[in-house]
Amino acid sequence: MLKDLVGLFILVLLLSAPVFAEERKPFIAGGVTFLDKHEVLSVEMGAEVLPNINWSLGFNAPIDSGEQEHFGTHWAEKQVWGLHTALGYEIRVNDMLAITPRIGLNYNNVEIEYFEEETGEYVDTDSQNNFEPTLGVKVDIASVGLIVEGYKIDEDISLSEEDEVAVRVMAAYNF
């Protein structure tokens, strides 16, 4: 499954390559999204598509084997993967410092499998596709940057009873 997801991400990058190739200031970023007690690897590629306007496209893939939670006589295992995109306006403070507020859209594919507590037998699967808006900021110092974004987790995909916020933290390198 992960191989298919990586293939999909590479296909999307290849389709968007002409946009990145013609524009200035490309960057690549990598980090982690903390999603409901679940860590998801995040990779992103972006560039300046208009003067001071940055656009990026990224991919999220699971790092671990999945989050597990117990519900009475059942336990559940959750797997998450997704895509994200963001658009930002770069504010150049000086030659070495730029701040880019970002808004974006995050897509998550979530699969939750339920198992019997005592026997470990499979009981049911719940699969969902969710889109959530994101807010964030990218801070660049010379050629190194930090991207922090957040979005509210849909309560239908959370194994927690409380409202949760996903946080994506990535280090970026500007070419």
Residue ranges and their predicted role:
Residues 1-25, 175:
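Cleavable N-terminal export/targeting peptides
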Residues 19-69:
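Short glycine/proline- and aromatic-enriched beta-strand/turn motifs that initiate or cap beta-hairpins
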Residues 26, 39-45, 81-85, 131-135, ...:
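Hydrophobic, lipid-facing positions within transmembrane beta-strands of outer-membrane proteins
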Residues 26-28, 51-57, 95-99, 141-148:
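Repeated loop/turn-to-beta-strand initiation elements of outer-membrane beta-barrel proteins
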Residues 30-42, 93-95, 154-165:
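Solvent-exposed loop/turn segments connecting transmembrane beta-strands
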Residues 32-36, 59-65, 91, 105-111, ...:
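Transmembrane beta-strands of outer-membrane beta-barrel pores
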Residues 55-57, 61-81, 107-131, 154-162, ...:
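Flexible, solvent-exposed loop segments that connect beta-strands
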Residues 139-145, 162-175:
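Outer-membrane beta-barrel "beta-signal"
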